[in-house]
Amino acid sequence: MTGFGARLAAAKAQRGPLCVGIDPHPELLRAWDLPTTADGLAAFCDICVEAFAGFAVVKPQVAFFEAYGAAGFAVLERTIAALRSAGVLVLADAKRGDIGTTMAAYAAAWAGDSPLAADAVTASPYLGFGSLRPLLEAAAAHDRGVFVLAATSNPEGATVQRAAFDGRTVAQLVVDQAAVVNRSTNPAGPGYVGVVVGATVLQPPDLSALGGPVLVPGLGVQGGRPEALAGLGGAEPGQLLPAVAREVLRAGPDVAELRAAADRMLDAVAYLDA
């Protein structure tokens, strides 16, 4: 299988630089006249799969599936499989982070041969970047990607991410350590380790040497503006992967309306890969 960085670049070139989120919040299920049950969750996801099958990347928010227990995980497995069958890259927004054998177990679940394994997964480095090693190794072995939280847009994040250590912010250290992995594993091409930088972050870390993709959540309802993303953190053209969820999902449940809302956002960010 081709490495994740190359597959992501190819998907963006063919389908455009947008990641669409599947966030089945109970309020959204009710707004779509669906029950807040595993059956309602499944119906919500079926609609999203049909609407977003033509986009490059789709990002299910794992927490909303976990809330329904085993039945929710079954819906997530089915949704991941359906999206991948449609040629969509799936980014599982699980934000996993732990140490030792526990991290290795998370790695097996989200980046190994598990039915939950997607094309990429989000991860938290705040037990130390080195704690992610089992996940990074599993992802590399299975040609999957990892997006590591660096600078998030929630106000609380700044208390940790903008703290200084060894002359750099913690967010910059995360980016720099991800860059080391990318240089050591794929110096000639796009790496498989990306970072997450919120669209509303006022002082983003320097991304120019990352050598991997940058997931940029927070467009639309959360305040991020597509026209303001160019050159975020010194990113190169084609490096950014903007993500949107609520701005699009509130157009549902009609499949055509959902697809049109996602298309409008894609049109707004297409210049980033031009």
Swiss-Prot record:
SUPFAM superfamilies tied to this protein: Ribulose-phoshate binding barrel
EC number(s) from the headed UniProt entry: 4.1.1.23
SMART domains cross-referenced by the UniProt entry: OMPdecase
GO biological process: 'de novo' pyrimidine nucleobase biosynthetic process; 'de novo' UMP biosynthetic process
Keywords: Decarboxylase, Lyase, Pyrimidine biosynthesis
Pfam family, any one: OMPdecase
InterPro entries found in the cross-reference section: Aldolase_TIM (IPR013785), OMPdecase_AS (IPR018089), OMPdecase_type-2 (IPR011995), OMPdeCOase_dom (IPR001754), RibuloseP-bd_barrel (IPR011060)
Highest taxon in the source lineage: Bacteria
UniProt pathway: Pyrimidine metabolism; UMP biosynthesis via de novo pathway; UMP from orotate: step 2/2
Reaction catalyzed: orotidine 5'-phosphate + H(+) = UMP + CO2
Record's protein name: Orotidine 5'-phosphate decarboxylase
Species of the source: Mycolicibacterium paratuberculosis (strain ATCC BAA-968 / K-10)
Gene: pyrF
